[in-house]
C-alpha cells in the first residue's frame, strides 16, 4: 500500500488526468453480493491511464487496493432517513475510511439537514481535528456550499452533487458554471457529475481544475447503452 500523498503531491498526480469512479449499488447490473467486479473496472481504468479511482464501501476499496496503487477517493454510501445526505454522512463512515489509508475521503458537504445535527463547517473541523493528515474532499451542489467547505479547511471541493439537491442548478450535463466559479475563487476543484464525453472533460480541464472524476460514462454499461439507444430514437 503506497504512502498517503501530500496535497501538493496528489495534485501533481491528478493534474490533466481522469479519475475513474468504480461503483455499483444493490439493484444495479454490476453489483455483486460477493464482490470482485469493481477491482476489474479499476484495473481497466488503470490500464487506460487513469490517474485515480473513486470507490464506495470498505469492501470495494480493499479489493481495489489489492490490484492497484492508484490514489483512491473513498466514500461510504449509507442512508440515514429522514435526512438526505448519504455520502460519508457521519463520523462513523469517516472512521471506517480513515482506517484504509486512502488518499482522500470524500463526504457530503451540502447545507441539507444532517443525521448528526452538525452544520458542515463543524463536521469538517471535527474530522480535521481527528485525522489531521487525511486529505478531504467536499461533495457539494452550489458555490456557497463549496465556499463554506473551503473556508472550513477542506482540501478539495467536488461538484458531485450539483443537480442532485432540489435547490442546485439542474443540468443535463456537467455544471460548468459552478466549476468555473469555484476555480476562479482559488479553490482546488475536483469536477464530478454528469461528465458524459471526452469533449466535456477537455473543456473542464481547460478551466484549471485540480482533477476530473468520470463515472457513469466509463463504468456503467447500462447507462452507456441507454445513451446510444435513446440517440437512435430521437
Curated annotation (Swiss-Prot):
Listed GO cellular component terms?
cytosol
Cite the EC number.
5.1.3.9
Q: Which pathway does the record list?
A: Amino-sugar metabolism; N-acetylneuraminate degradation; D-fructose 6-phosphate from N-acetylneuraminate: step 3/5
Q: What class of enzyme is it?
A: isomerase
Alphabetic keyword roster: Carbohydrate metabolism, Isomerase
Q: Which GO terms describe its molecular function?
A: N-acylglucosamine-6-phosphate 2-epimerase activity
Catalysed reactions, as listed in the record: an N-acyl-D-glucosamine 6-phosphate = an N-acyl-D-mannosamine 6-phosphate
UniProt record, GO biological process: carbohydrate metabolic process; N-acetylmannosamine catabolic process; N-acetylneuraminate catabolic process
Query: Which InterPro entries did the record assign?
Result: Aldolase_TIM, NanE, RibuloseP-bd_barrel
> Which HAMAP family does the annotation name?
ManNAc6P_epimer
**Its family?**
Belongs to the NanE family.
Cited function? Converts N-acetylmannosamine-6-phosphate (ManNAc-6-P) to N-acetylglucosamine-6-phosphate (GlcNAc-6-P).
Please state what the protein is called.
Putative N-acetylmannosamine-6-phosphate 2-epimerase
Taxonomy, top ranks, is: Bacteria, Bacillati, Bacillota, Bacilli, Lactobacillales
